[in-house]
Amino acid sequence: MSQDHESLENLLNEDRQFPPTAEFAAQANATAALYELAEKDRLAFWDLQAKALSWETPWTQTLQWEAPYAQWFVGGKINASFNALDRHVIEGRGDRVAFHFEGEPGDTRTITYAQLLVEVKKTANALIELGIQAKDRVAIYMPMIPEAAIAMLACARIGAAHSVVFGGFSADALLSRIQDADAKLVITADGGFRKGGAFALKPAVDEALKGQHNVKNVLVVQRTKQETAWNSATDIWWHEIVDRQSAEHTAQGFDSEHPLFILYTSGTTAKPKGIFHTTGGYLTQAAYTHRIVFDIKPETDVYWCTADVGWITGHSYIVYGPLMNGATQVMYEGTPDTPHKGRIFELIEKYGVTILYTAPTLIRTWMKWGDEFPNKFNLSSLRLLGSVGEPINPEAWMWYREVIGGNRCPIVDTWWQTETGGIMISPLPGVTATKPGSAVTAIPGISAVVVDDNANPVAKGHGGFLILDKPWPGMLRGVWGEDERYKETYWSRFKGIYFAGDGAKLDKDGAIWLLGRVDDVMNVSGHRISTTEVESALVSHESVAEAAVVGAQDAMTGQGIVAFVILRGGIAHASGEKLVTELRNHVAKEIGAIAKPRQILVVAELPKTRSGKIMRRLLKDVAENRQVGDATTLADPNVMKLISEGLNTSKDED
């Protein structure tokens, strides 16, 4: 890219702004003073946040930093499980509900902090009986049931690092993660309930364990009571070993830098990256961010994060952050459309949910289904909404605010990653004015900068690369067993500065707008255009519910823009060519003629991973007439076949 060229075009303008109400600001956990406090002395600020937790041994040094290696709260000793559970019970909060669990078939469990603590202690004792020690690794492959959180907390209690593998992953994916972490134990279930029926999990574990590994036992929760193949030499039913354990177990403190968990993210190469987090810094950031970003009032709020514990969002904002803050949560096993498309809204009404944290992909799905589903239920208990996982289009943001939030709930659009451990960029409710589609600003204590090719900060109104130029407590400590890969992946683009591949722009007010992965930037006739901006322009059209955009090779322009769109419910696909022309012109009007898609294909579904992220590389394969690459992590592998057939019959525009 030439030096005088913009790192990333800033094309889409968004002027709507929503300042906090006086009423919300008056009761908010966050204040504007937090920014000043953190700015004045960053390390003293993080010291203060760490002191909100219970430490067995205080630390002697806040930060030891030799890029790219950080140690936080050096010399301190802490137990994650004690902070999530014991201290609440000791301080008289044992009767507070920790989880309202709702199974997909409609079975429910209400679990208090005292009850959760007993279950975690018994499970910790069972792990010890199975020979698991501090520093061992345990793989967890579970449905969204309370035992998933119990297993994680029991591992943390005895100092064994957990590696949670999302229950939708294949046997091969599970085996590669078991091997990489050298897990000694796998905790799983016979299966779970999804889309109206039982699915099996144990067979994938059995299949995975045909490979090379050092797993000694498989601990199995009986969730569905389906017939399950059994190896009596290694397999143990959870209820048979856990139920008979003592409910006494004293949690010991582990070094602040003791590994807490490994979580695998897909790499560009075949081998997934084992992102590992340690204890003291991660817990500090998870608890602090959950408290200020979600304005949590543990005595009165009912909080619901719709993520799966198999993802970092489930680790930080279901298991660790909320429990450390003594929150009451909803945990739901099933899918948003079972037994009907209003299921999430029905549960918000049933449990009086006050804070909802979900993903743009689900918000756009709700838009596609139509307003009648949320409108059937009373959502007046909601007081704050959150978004996580990818940039949210302004139109989806506005719909979320108006239809779900009744125009009264602040929206926290949060940017962070598996690697960062906790939220890094987000409005603070009660303090920050929000803008549809913008994550606005780094939270107090975090330094995030948008820079050009030479690591110089860009001016307002310009785009570039998002970097984190100062260490933070929740940061990854490396890629498990692959030190060179850690340095190469995150620290090589800008020397000694963390860059994880996201593009961003600053608007005229200096607010940060995330533009997705820089790999998702298209180069059209020398203009670098973000897929996110073109997608947002398409979704702002009244007919479009969801859009995915890729750059495909083009003899004339270098790359041509190819768009795949899902129409809103009730709009006939027959509108065909007329609608396609209208959409191309709409993008030109919103962004400029340079961003006009070369081709637009109306599709029924988009290829998404099981966590809801759109797999643009597969769409790029189709757009460039290549054989479609590895689609094993797709939620629905048939989607690509249908899209390929559709694109071959659609014509290029002028």
Residue spans for each PLM region:
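Structural core segment of the AMP-binding/adenylate-forming
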Residues: 153, 157-240, 352, 359-360
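Gly/Ser/Thr-rich phosphate-binding loop
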Residues: 239, 320, 324-327, 354-358, ...
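Conserved AMP-binding/adenylation subdomain of ANL enzymes
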Residues: 283-302, 312-355, 368-370
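Conserved pre-ATP/AMP-binding loop-to-beta segment of ANL
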Residues: 95-97, 218-220, 231-264, 271, ...
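Conserved AMP-binding/adenylate-forming core of the ANL superfamily
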Residues: 81-82, 95, 99-153, 170-175, ...
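Conserved structural elements of the adenylate-forming
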Residues: 120-121, 243, 275-296
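Conserved ATP/PPi-binding loop(s) of AMP-dependent carboxylate-activating enzymes
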Residues: 441-445, 456-490, 529, 627-628
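AMP-binding/adenylate-forming catalytic core of the ANL superfamily
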Residues: 165-191, 205, 349, 356, ...
